[in-house]
Amino acid sequence: MKKQPIVALESTVIAHGLPWPTNFETAVSMENKVKEKGAIPKTLGIINGEIKIGLTEKEIEHLAKAKNVMKIGTAEIAAAIALRRNAATTVSATMRLAKNAGIDVFATGGIGGVHRNVPWDVSQDIMELSKTRMIVVCAGFKSILDVERTIEFLETFQVTVVGYQTDYMPLFHTKESEYKVNIRADSPEEIVAIFNEKEKLGIEGAILVANPIPEQSEIPREELEEYIKKAVAQAKENGISGKSLTPFLLSRLTELSGGKTLTANIALLKNNASLAGEIAVALSRGGRD
């Protein structure tokens, strides 16, 4: 039976990644971008301990405004349900819940990885990417991370990284880096073909589609590095670590850049949702035009 073209979307960007009302507006825009491509968006989250595969607009607004929303990876899913909490799903939790619901395509902003100056702080996202068969569309990984170590971790954990219409790893707010990708795909159909072969071979793990931010929205690497260094130093001074670190750094980057990073973040999220919609449609057709 032909599967419906469904795209999973995460909710951490709603509850912890963007300020109100930008968070709500961006979540709705991402869903609309998926629909424009002929696919069905499903934003995931947990409301009062209940898993929601497809939040309503009212539920999205609730997560966007509510206080004390848990930020959960795969490790915290069970606790959020058992304790009847409101929870926003990160990349790892969204992947696990989406796969359990039979969804194969997921769009996010950027994946987590290894933090700068804290090499033992490695995101659950990498472990989930190594285990769960899914197509994950992102703009690379967040530029606040240790780029080289994150690339090495992805390779060690056998995550298939595919540059979309690029030979270089994009870095979230920046279109390109000096780090080459081993695999390039130039169409949704090529991505689906790789996914189908992995399925046939029974190889675990995701295909991480690195989709560069649109050129008109990117921030020059040198300029961005200045903001990041300041934000990382401030996090260290304030003793911020763990799950609080990424939201803190992204918030500081918005302030330090005069809102440039926020504008870039929104642009890449919408761009990734569009590509994921195209991939989901291609997958539902079997990967051929």
UniProtKB/Swiss-Prot annotation:
Catalyzes the reversible cleavage of pseudouridine 5'-phosphate (PsiMP) to ribose 5-phosphate and uracil. Functions biologically in the cleavage direction, as part of a pseudouridine degradation pathway. Mn(2+) binds at residue 121. Keywords: Glycosidase, Hydrolase, Lyase, Manganese, Metal-binding. One of its GO terms (cellular component) is cytoplasm. This is Pseudouridine-5'-phosphate glycosidase. It comes from Kosmotoga olearia (strain ATCC BAA-1733 / DSM 21960 / TBF 19.5.1). Binds 1 Mn(2+) ion per subunit. Substrate binds at residues 71, 91, 123-125. The gene is psuG. Its EC number is 4.2.1.70. GO terms for biological process: nucleobase catabolic process. It catalyses: D-ribose 5-phosphate + uracil = psi-UMP + H2O. Signal peptide: none annotated. InterPro entries: Indigdn_synthA-like (IPR022830), PsuG (IPR007342). Belongs to the pseudouridine-5'-phosphate glycosidase family. Its cofactor is Mn(2+). Gene3D superfamilies: Indigoidine synthase domain. Homotrimer. GO terms for molecular function: hydrolase activity, acting on glycosyl bonds; metal ion binding; pseudouridylate synthase activity. Coiled coil: none annotated. The active site is at residues 10, 142.
